């Protein structure tokens, strides 16, 4: 763990996959990852209830309904962002999920609007309907519209303009709700600025590409002054985690894990060697988790970690 207190959200998983697929494939997690929220996609209350019940049995702390994904595939399934047109149906879904998983918080993630709509009121109506008809009190708001036509999912994360002011206004008008802002947030200073207006901040791609951004979050945002994880500790934990996953015999190979580690040494001398070694097909083929430590040695030699923080030797 880089941060002990920050919530981790899974990728969106179709409720049908959870119900009819291999539950371990979609729901199994490491106990050290908590608090963790499972994000579900779907629009059938009964299916979402079944998926929520399974998630609760796997120890998830929260179950989040995605009402923000704009991809054509998701639209064909009549869920994701297009659900913002169906607040009553979303309410039925949330209520069914909560009844099936009473020990979990049930939340919703959505956009500020659809297509090129610029009026604030439909957003307020959507949130107001859910606040009135369900026990949901946490709303994670991506501060962009979802364009249902004309943009790819990737473009939908960048092209529609950000309207942070709409999310701030939601918090002012619904002070009893927990409003969490998402979209285009990349630095700790930006996080701190948003927290002057809303209850929480969700950071997505920046954490994936630069995970050590999270290293100081416990101190900065949770008041936990314990020493953050060192780079050396993290490399050792990654090696142990990879070894455990390989030993579990579920078909996982080192390449499947290592590709998600590439950003961990972002900004350090030797980061290029780290990325190269952990993406080299020949080096990965033996499935030897010690490769992680060998890659770490390249970074360690190129930086001074004597006081716990890296100082480039160049």
Regions found by a protein language model. Name each.
Residues 1-61:
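Glycine-rich, positively charged N-terminal anion/phosphate-binding segment
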Residues 10, 61-71, 133-146, 203-207:
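Non-cysteine beta-strand/loop elements that form the S-adenosyl-L-methionine
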Residues 13-15, 41-43, 68-70, 111-115, ...:
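Active-site beta-loop-alpha junctions enriched in small/polar residues
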Residues 35-107, 111-119:
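Active-site beta->alpha loop and helix N-cap motifs at the rims of alpha/beta catalytic domains
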Residues 40, 82, 86, 109, ...:
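Glycine- and other small-residue-rich loops at beta-strand/loop junctions that grip anionic moieties
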Residues 72-89, 120-121, 150-163, 223-225:
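Glycine-rich tight-turn/loop motif centered on a GG-T
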Residues 92-95, 99-101, 105, 114-116, ...:
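Alpha/beta catalytic cores of nucleotide-metabolism and tRNA/nucleoside-modifying enzymes
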